[in-house]
Structure formats: C-alpha cells, structure tokens
C-alpha cells in the first residue's frame, strides 16, 4: 500500500499500519470523529508522532518558521484572575505597567532597527472595566476604552515604523476587531480549552469570565466573519483530560473549516508559578504533551502548529518529531512579559537546533505566507492598507527576505 508517494508509512506498528483511518487522514478524506478520538487515545505515541510528521511534511516540507518580534507590554492590569497567571498586576504593584503611546512606539522603533517585523501588543482583559486607574490612564490619553487606544497605537506603529502589529488583548468583540482590521496583520487569542468544567469552582478559569469557552468561541467566530487571520491555542496541563484536549482541537478545526482564518495553533505547556493558586500543580508529563502535540497536527492538518521554545528549553527540538512547524514569536531585544522567568533562546540557537533536526529555519511575518502569496486568499485576508508594508519584506514564498534580516537593505 502506498500513500501519496510517502515511503515511511511502513515504519508504523502493524496494528496502526493496518488501520484504514490513517490513510483517510493522510488523504484528507472524511473521518468519523469517534474513530479519530479512539485512535488518538489508544495508539502508541511513536505511531502518532510519525503520522503527525507525515502530515506536517506534506504541507511544509522542511521549512520551520518563527516571527522576529518585539513584545510591547501595553498594560498588565486585567479584570480576570486566572489561577496560573503572574502576568496580571494590581495597580499598587511596582511592576504594574501602563505605557503611553510614545513609549510603545519607541519599543517598536528599536524592533525595526533589530530587523524585527512583528509588533506584538499585549494587554490584560478589559482592565478599564475593573480598575479606575486604567480608566483614568485611558482618559488622560484621550480614549474612552482600551480598544480605541489599540486602534490608534496600531496605526501609529505601522505608519511610523513599518512594523506589523499583532494584538493580543483577550476576547475582543466583532466591533473591536473591526477597529484593528486595517492596521493589524493578525490577532492573537488563546482558546485555552473548550471545557466548561475548567470554569467551575476550584478550576483554573473559575475567576476568569473571559475564559468561558462561549466567550472565546464568539471571538474566534467574529474574527472569521471579518476574514481576520488569528492565532489561537491551548494551555496543556491545567487539569484537563486528554479527551478535552481533543474536543478543543476539533472545535478549533470546525471553526477554521467554515472561515479559513485560523493561521496557527499554539500548544503551550503549563508551568506552575510561585504565588499563584496553581503553584503546586504539576506540569504536563513529557509523553502526555507529545501526544497532545501530535493530536493537534493530526486534527488540524494544514493549520500551522507552534510550541514556544522558551517553555521547554532542554527538549523543544523534540517537538519537531511530533509535527510542529513553527516556533512562534521570538524577540532579540524584549523579554517574554507573560513568562519572564523563561527567556527565549537566541534565534541563532533555535536555528542550530532546527538544522540539527534536518530543517531550515526561516522568518515569517505575523500573517502567514499562505495568506500573502495566494492571490485569492490575499485579497480576502490581507487588508489593502497593509500591502504596501508587507510587499517589500517578503520573498516569493511569502517569507521574510534574508537580506532584510541581514540588514542588506
């Protein structure tokens, strides 16, 4: 039996090899969700990894990508209180941040000098609805709410620096997203998990209303209705079951089948942090996380799949064996303000690790190449106001030109 000319299928175990469902998956035929779930739960991890790498190689060949970025921590006050988070700060905390636009633009300008292309703008969830300090900060800046500030700041960043904004401000409404459509190449919003159980008393999202799956799903759908490319993802190891991981991935895939706008899914491993309600919880085991990653590739197929390298500093290269094709945003000049205890590896080190696994590391923009080089998709998903900023940066593959990164023009 042959599968689309693929030669390494014979390395599957006998039981896996004889299962017709794997050939349906590879050939993108309709697969019964119950059969798929049974396969993902019961198959040996080495078989799932091999299937995941076959699927990844069909779509991405030997190219692994990353986004060269700066992290603009605009405001870290947040109305939610997730049980695992240290990003959120109270207004009285000396580490509380409320930048003014000139400070944010200065960071973006430093990024441009460092040949970055993405300006990641991160905020807490609707801080002005909980904190008078945040409301006063916005008023002093001449805005009624955070969305107005994000729209204004994004326009200034792209026009003054040429950097492409990618905003992650939580569960935005359709109206709020539309305010960012002409200035942001894409958006970011983690689904985290689609299980309502995780919002119950004592669970990770009990005190985080915006993490209610209904709220997050509404935002994912709104982005789809706007043809707005978005990156989402799951947080693995917050007391979810593997079945809940599968259901979450199936939900993401169903939304993308309808709209085609989910450009990337992040599989993020939970790390307990001191001072949080979950500081004594355990991180997901390595085999479990590998199974989750492989399941993501098998379910999502041609959606880009990322694992943050800074959260698995000693083993992140192994995730290439489970089907990932992207390392996400890596900054040469700013820290990961969400996980400051986990510094990014250098881009040079990521390149070495990637090449040792037989892949080529290339920089991408915060909007994925398929939305740029395909004329039909480009007209739909890339806003016309951004095209003049995008075109000088990319090669024929929709990736960042090497000569730009090397400061040759």
Regions found by a protein language model. Give the residues of each.
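Glycine-rich, proline-tolerant flexible connector loops at the mouths of alpha/beta enzymes
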Residues: 68-70, 92, 122-142, 271-277, ...
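Conserved Radical SAM active-site core
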Residues: 91-257
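Auxiliary Fe-S-binding modules of radical SAM enzymes
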Residues: 1-43, 105, 112, 242, ...
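Active-site phosphate/pyrophosphate- and oxyanion-stabilizing loops and adjacent acidic/basic residues
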Residues: 53, 72, 155, 294
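Active-site-proximal loop/turn and secondary-structure-junction residues that shape catalytic pockets
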Residues: 70-72, 125-127, 169-173, 193-195, ...
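An N-cap/entry alpha-helix motif that binds or orients negatively charged groups
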Residues: 30-65
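Hydrophobic faces of well-ordered beta-strands that scaffold small-molecule active sites
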Residues: 64-70, 119, 165-167, 187-189, ...
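Canonical Radical SAM [4Fe-4S] cluster-binding loop centered on the CxxxCxxC motif
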Residues: 58, 64-106, 126-127
């Amino acid at each position: 039996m042959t599968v689309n000319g693929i030669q390494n299928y014979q390395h599957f175990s006998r039981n896996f090899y004889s299962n017709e469902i794997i050939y349906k998956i590879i050939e993108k035929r309709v697969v019964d969700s119950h059969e798929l779930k049974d396969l993902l739960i019961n198959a040996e991890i080495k078989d799932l990894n091999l299937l995941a790498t076959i699927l990844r190689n069909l779509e991405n060949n030997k190219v692994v990508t990353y986004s060269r970025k700066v992290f603009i921590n605009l405001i870290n006050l947040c109305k939610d209180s997730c049980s695992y988070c240290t990003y959120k700060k109270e207004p009285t905390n000396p580490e509380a941040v409320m930048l003014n636009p000139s400070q944010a633009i200065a960071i973006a300008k430093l990024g441009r000098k460092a040949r970055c292309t993405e300006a990641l703008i991160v905020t807490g969830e609707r801080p002005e609805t909980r904190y008078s300090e945040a409301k006063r900060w916005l008023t002093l800046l001449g805005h009624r709410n955070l969305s107005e500030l994000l729209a204004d700041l994004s326009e200034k960043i792209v026009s003054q620096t040429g950097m492409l904004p990618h905003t992650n401000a939580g569960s935005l409404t359709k109206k709020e997203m539309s305010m960012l459509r002409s200035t942001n190449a894409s958006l970011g919003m983690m689904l985290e998990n689609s299980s309502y159980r995780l919002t119950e008393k004592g669970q990770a999202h009990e005190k985080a209303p915006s993490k209610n799956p209904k709220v997050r799903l509404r935002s994912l759908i709104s982005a789809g209705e706007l043809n707005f490319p978005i990156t989402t993802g799951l947080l693995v190891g917050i007391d979810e079951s593997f079945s809940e991981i599968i259901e979450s991935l199936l939900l993401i895939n169903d939304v993308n089948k309808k709209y085609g706008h989910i450009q990337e899914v992040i599989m993020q491993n939970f790390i307990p942090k001191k001072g949080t309600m979950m500081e004594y919880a355990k991180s997901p085991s390595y085999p479990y996380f590998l199974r989750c990653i492989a399941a993501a590739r098998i379910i999502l197929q041609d959606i880009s799949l990322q694992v943050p390298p800074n959260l698995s500093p000693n083993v992140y290269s192994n995730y290439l064996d489970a089907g990932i094709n992207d390392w996400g945003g890596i900054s040469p000049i700013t820290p990961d303000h969400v996980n400051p205890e986990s510094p990014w590896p250098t881009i040079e080190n990521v390149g070495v690790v990637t090449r040792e696994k037989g892949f080529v590391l290339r920089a991408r923009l915060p909007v994925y190449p398929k939305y740029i080089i395909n004329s039909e998709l480009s007209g739909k998903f890339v806003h016309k106001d951004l095209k003049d900023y995008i075109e000088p940066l990319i090669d024929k593959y929709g990736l960042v030109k090497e000569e730009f990164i090397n400061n040759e023009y």
